[in-house]
């Protein structure tokens, strides 16, 4: 059997279940999928392994809360392999709300226009499953054709409203409060960023943010871009600085100011133009539910975005300020810290550190 890896309505590669491969549009390949046209047995095995891993990554992360309930609902194993997870994702054509890639079988008569998730509605049954761990009936199993690949440890789901999709994130009141407070602070600085608001779902607090992707723009994680750069003899961080140094430095500044210790390589990356499959800048800064951690000293935690260098968050932020300035556009209102006076003192101390470094 041959699978066709699609970018919107264009076939970018064909791959058989034995690893035989033909790359049709190399410039439009997924950044984190490596396929090699070869008769070599080992390279063909690698093709199949890479393909199933890529498909599985478009499903859900197994450490995600309520993953068991989601897998139970579609009759999957509790401890699934990449291949099993890939088969689950393939049953929904590997669709995602993060990009416009999908997969179909050779000669399958189906179009992206007819199934893409940006234009076709989702069921509220999905929201229940993803956020609350409700058991889903077999008859609703097909409604899982949504984005379950947002990753992370916190329950989350995309919800369609009249003006587009919104991400609802659970994780408990404290995580929601941290994310919303961090968002209020970040808005006082000039930076492309996701705006988080507090809301309720089934009488529980959630943070709510609008989707940043569309049929025109996709999201590529740093992890995916690193795969691409590694296989094209490029230094990932150098390429990012060449593309959009201001956004990179603002990320390090804001993560330091709000004490975000969870800037791992899956929650920052590139915004890609789907017309060309080329990056245009870093995508909007997101994910602040682990803010105000290790927030009792000016140093902060180790910075996770500086490659192989060993820098504290303070050192990375000072370096950033010396490159681009602070870019504060308005004062942070003291009232946002009304319930956390200790955080207010630390924030002001860290802000002074950066102002003095300019």
Residue ranges and their predicted role:
Residues 1-253, 257-258, 271-358:
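Phosphate/dinucleotide-binding and metal-coordinating scaffold of catalytic cores
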Residues 261:
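Glycine-rich phosphate-binding P-loop
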């Amino acid at each position: 059997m041959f699978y066709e890896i699609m970018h919107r309505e264009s076939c970018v590669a064909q791959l058989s279940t034995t690893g035989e491969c033909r790359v049709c549009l190399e410039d439009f390949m997924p950044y984190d999928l490596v396929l090699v046209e070869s008769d070599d047995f080992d390279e063909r095995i690698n093709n199949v392994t890479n393909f199933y891993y890529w498909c599985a990554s478009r499903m859900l992360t197994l450490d995600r809360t309520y993953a068991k309930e989601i897998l139970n609902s579609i009759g999957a194993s509790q401890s699934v392999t990449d291949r099993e997870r890939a088969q689950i994702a393939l049953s929904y054509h590997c669709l995602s709300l993060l990009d416009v890639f999908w997969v179909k079988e050779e000669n399958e008569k189906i179009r992206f226009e007819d199934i893409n998730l940006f234009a076709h509605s989702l069921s509220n049954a999905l929201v229940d499953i993803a956020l609350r761990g409700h058991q889903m009936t077999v008859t609703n199993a097909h409604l899982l054709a949504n984005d379950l690949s947002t990753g992370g440890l916190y329950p989350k789901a995309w919800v369609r409203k009249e003006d587009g999709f919104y991400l609802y994130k659970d994780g408990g009141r404290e995580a929601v409060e941290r994310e919303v407070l961090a968002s209020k602070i970040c808005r006082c600085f000039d930076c492309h960023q996701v705006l988080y608001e507090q809301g309720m779902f089934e009488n529980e607090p959630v943070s709510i943010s609008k989707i940043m992707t569309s049929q025109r723009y996709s999201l590529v994680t740093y992890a995916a871009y690193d795969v691409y750069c590694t296989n094209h003899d490029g230094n990932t961080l150098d390429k990012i600085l060449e593309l959009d140094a201001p956004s990179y430095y603002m990320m390090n500044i804001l993560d330091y100011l709000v004490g975000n210790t969870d800037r791992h390589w899956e929650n920052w990356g590139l915004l890609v133009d789907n017309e060309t499959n080329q990056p245009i800048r870093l995508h909007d800064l997101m994910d602040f539910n682990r803010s105000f951690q290790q927030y009792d000293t000016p140093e902060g935690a180790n910075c996770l975005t500086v490659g192989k260098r060993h820098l504290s968050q303070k050192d990375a932020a000072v370096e950033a300020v010396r490159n681009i300035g602070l870019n504060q556009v308005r004062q942070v209102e003291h009232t946002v810290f009304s319930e956390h006076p200790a955080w207010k003192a630390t924030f002001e101390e860290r802000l002074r550190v950066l102002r003095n470094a300019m």
